[in-house]
Design a protein with these regions (language model features):
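Phosphate-binding chemistry for phosphorylated carbohydrates and sugar-nucleotides
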Residues: 1-117
Length: 117
C-alpha cells in the first residue's frame, strides 16, 4: 500500500507542540511517504500549547491549522506521542476523522494483510 500511495498522498503532520515532531516526520519518510507537510505552527515543543485549547489528537479542534494545509491525510500525535489522531479529505473537500478504535482496526488489518504476503 505504501509503495502505491507513498508518492501520491499528501500528509500533514503535527506533534501539537510536543516532543514527537522530528521522530514522527522521520518515521513517515522512512516508511516511504514523500509528500509530508509539517504543521510549522505546532511543530516546535512549547509547553503552554499556544495554538490548541487541549493538545489531544482525539479532539478534532486540534486539526484546525492543519486543515489549512489542504493535505489528503492529517496526522496528529499528542505531546508525548503515545496517542494519534487521523483525518482524511473527502470528495467534497471536508475532513472526516477516525476514532481510536477505527485507527486500531486499520492498523491490525494492515499488519495481518502484510504478514500474508
Amino acid at each position: 500500500m505504501i509503495k502505491k500511495w507513498g508518492d501520491k498522498l499528501t500528509i500533514s503532520f503535527t506533534p501539537l507542540h510536543g516532543a514527537g515532531g522530528d521522530l514522527g516526520s522521520k518515521a513517515l519518510k522512512e516508511a516511504g511517504f514523500n509528500k509530508i507537510l509539517t504543521v510549522k505552527e505546532q511543530f516546535k515543543p512549547d509547553g503552554p500549547f499556544p495554538t490548541v485549547k487541549y493538545p489531544n489528537p482525539e479532539f478534532h479542534e486540534v486539526f484546525k491549522i492543519s486543515e489549512s494545509y489542504g493535505a489528503d491525510v492529517e496526522l496528529a500525535v499528542d505531546p508525548d506521542s503515545d496517542r494519534m489522531g487521523v483525518g482524511y479529505r473527502t470528495k467534497d473537500g471536508s475532513y472526516n476523522y477516525l476514532t481510536g478504535n477505527q485507527i486500531a482496526a486499520l492498523m491490525v488489518n494492515y499488519i495481518l494483510t502484510a504478514q500474508q504476503k
